[in-house]
Amino acid sequence: AEAQKIIESGQRNKLLIVLPDELKQKDSPWIEPANQLAERGIHIQWSAVDQFFYNILRKPDQLDLVVTVSPYGRIFSKMISSLEGGLGAGFETHRSKNNQIMFQIMHPASSRFVGKDAADPIGAILSIAAFLESQNKPLISAAIRNVIEDAISAAWVTRDLGGSMGTIEIGDFICSKLSGKSTIA
């Protein structure tokens, strides 16, 4: 459902569904939604877990939007955040069968950065934007995403992504840009 919303918003046009070997494509609850998206021109791919791990390491630029089952999603998220080098630059979405949603920041575990103004707050802020989107607040969500894109374009990123900012500086930059857009409801 979350992937379908992202695709329908026009942000993505390619979806990869990763399933363990014991959950064959024919048993997936995603078959019907995937077929509906394919009918609308969205490129749908299916992958086994081992093939997905290979693609993460060999062809990461070919991956766009990925959905899978627990616990694989958590494993993939941690692995990808470690590969990208970000200390909190991304987030993951978990949705239960009864439609409860949880957004969680992706980052490798690293106690050596505690108290050093080194974590990247972008994933946390993007997860807030996703939460607001899920609560039918698309204008606020879009404003947050736009400010983050502006920050990245202006090279206002944390040291883990090659910038010179700390956690507090990038957070303050994003908040100051958002406060200038306070008329958005």
Task: Write out the residue ranges for each language-model feature.
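Glycine-rich phosphate/diphosphate-binding loop of Rossmann-like nucleotide-binding domains
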Residues: 1-48
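Glycine-rich phosphate/pyrophosphate-binding loop and the adjoining helix
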Residues: 1-15, 23, 138, 143, ...
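Buried hydrophobic packing segments
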Residues: 3, 34, 124-132, 174
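Short, catalytically relevant binding-site loops at active-site mouths
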Residues: 23, 50-53, 72-74
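Hydrophobic alpha-helical scaffolding
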Residues: 23-24, 42, 46, 65, ...
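Conserved structured core elements
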Residues: 28, 46-50, 122, 138, ...
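A structured beta-alpha segment of the ubiquitous adenosine-cofactor-binding alpha/beta core
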Residues: 43-62
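Glycine-rich phosphate/nucleotide-binding loop
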Residues: 57-154
